[in-house]
Amino acid sequence: QKTAYEIKECDWSSDVCSSDLDASTGKLKWYYQTVPTDSWDLDSVGGFIMADVTIEGRNRKVIMQAPKSGVFYILDRTNGQFISAEPFVPVNWVTGFDKKNNGKPIINQDAFYDQQKSVLIYPGGGGAHNWAPMSYNPNAGLVYLPYSAGSYTFSAAAEPDPKAGGGAHGLGRGGERTTPMPIWGPDNVGRGGLQARDPKTNQIKWVKQGRGGAAAGGTMTTASNLVFQTAGTNLYVYRADTGEDLLALPFNIGGPAPPVTYTVDGTQYIGFATRTHFKIGRAHV
């Protein structure tokens, strides 16, 4: 039996997928492979956004996802038809998308690694967009996506062994087996931030560098043309259409969750959960 890093071709059931099930029958209606032959831990952690968007003069019922793979996918949610896929950070596991085959990702064959070959992959094992929620404002017509741009060096152990160590059996279990790349620097792509993307074109409208990555809690947007983002130890507020900075409120506690809004006795509030960096059990709101 082949190990994960020896598989170059496989069917959809073992890949990372977006799929649609008929709720009345439980049967599969359509699926789309976001990362065929995933050997880089680029699973689809991020949630989906459904919207009605005018694309090339047609009103499309779309589903959008920006998972760990670093690619922003837009599909027709009624039938799974591929509309577009654009990297939102530097990526090298994929070289393009086959529009003649419903946008199937074209895997970079040089991205596969083994016992003798280590490969530097963009994005890293933590992903370009993990659990932190993105949001969509239909009035501004933009998606607000917290992202992290980085890399990770993958290699394989000689034999499958849960005690292999040295990063050979998964991210976060011993570090990389080779010297890591520096995260920060003028010649390195290790950056986090917030992007406002236009789903009509799948391109960036505006961006906030340095307000994303692993310390970002996600975004929320309102009908009043505002975007709220928790990142690091700050709550940021922007104009939804232009990205103009309106507020940066420090709260001096790390690990924020995404902001939410609610109303009590006619007054609207913004809330978010945080924690210290030292004891997870010491939660603060």
Name each region found by the language model:
Residues 1, 122-126, 209:
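Short, solvent-exposed secondary-structure boundary motifs
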Residues 1-16, 280-284:
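Single conserved hydrophobic/aromatic residue that forms the stacking wall/gate
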Residues 116-120, 126-150:
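Long, low-complexity segments enriched in small/aliphatic residues
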Residues 2, 78, 148:
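Anionic group-transfer/hydrolysis microenvironments
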Residues 14-44, 51-59, 71-121, 151-215, ...:
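Extracytoplasmic/lumenal domain signature
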